[in-house]
Amino acid sequence: MFVPSGDSVPDLAGCTLLMPAVSVGNVGQLAIDLIISTLNMHKIGYFYTDCLVPMVGNNPYATAEENSAELSINAEVYALPSKKLVALQLRSIFIKYKSKSFCEKLLSWVKCSGCAKVVVLSSSHSYHRNDLQLRSTPFRYLLTPSMQKSVQNKIQSLNWEEMEKTPCIPEIDDSEFCVRVPGGGITKLLYDEGCSKEIPIAILLKFVSEGDNIPDALGLVEYLNEWLQIIKPHCEDPTASSLPWKMPSSWRLLFGSGLPPALF
């Protein structure tokens, strides 16, 4: 599944894998874009898979004309060895009935590569919130049992709110309660697979609506940064402006190109 860019397979033992779920507003994918661009992570390989819709494009993180013509595809892996970080970016949707196969192959690769933990950045439909969720923060987290053992104390110290269980079948009053992530794509599937296969997975998500989701992505990476300290503020002043996340060059065309002057 994983094809390295170089001649040798990179050593990912002990690394933290960051990845998005293709979810409402593409918030997770935008957040991974911010992380890769800000940390200037380099590409170490890609996933050769029939589970995603084929896609090819220019380098989304181009910083100069020299590297703008590099090609990118639907599933690529980036790394920053100095911080033991690996990022998987997904750029297309799943082919019908292929998402479970992808999750199984992905987690098998995670185990074989020796990654210490997986952090999934996701989102969920804001209109599915209940009254309690409407009155609280829009951010939530989920931890698989094997992840809870190692990070539960740290997470609790941040005063984060865990994703609440809701009726499995909302229309039935006495329905059993379970974890549901409406609009979350493979989020729930990854969580269930991680629980059954004892893989340490943390899911961080935000309740959002479709639209300009750049502010949601910025909020999600800052939420992640509270825990992992990917980048640190320049000063200790808590009232200082937000952290210097770098938007990739490809975001200039996030909503398409400008209107042609000939229209006027």
UniProtKB/Swiss-Prot annotation:
Its main location: nucleus. Chaperone protein which promotes assembly of the 20S proteasome as part of a heterodimer with PSMG1. The PSMG1-PSMG2 heterodimer binds to the PSMA5 and PSMA7 proteasome subunits, promotes assembly of the proteasome alpha subunits into the heteroheptameric alpha ring and prevents alpha ring dimerization. InterPro entries: Proteasome_assmbl_chaperone_2 (IPR019151), Proteasome_assmbl_chp_2_euk (IPR016562), PSMG2_sf (IPR038389). The modification Phosphothreonine is found at T137. This is Proteasome assembly chaperone 2. Forms a heterodimer with PSMG1. The PSMG1-PSMG2 heterodimer interacts directly with the PSMA5 and PSMA7 proteasome alpha subunits. Degraded by the proteasome upon completion of 20S proteasome maturation. GO terms for biological process: chaperone-mediated protein complex assembly; proteasome assembly. Gene3D superfamilies: PAC-like subunit. Keywords: Chaperone, Nucleus, Phosphoprotein. Signal peptide: none annotated. It is found in: Nucleus. GO terms for cellular component: cytosol; nucleus. Belongs to the PSMG2 family. It comes from Bos taurus. The keyword Phosphoprotein applies.
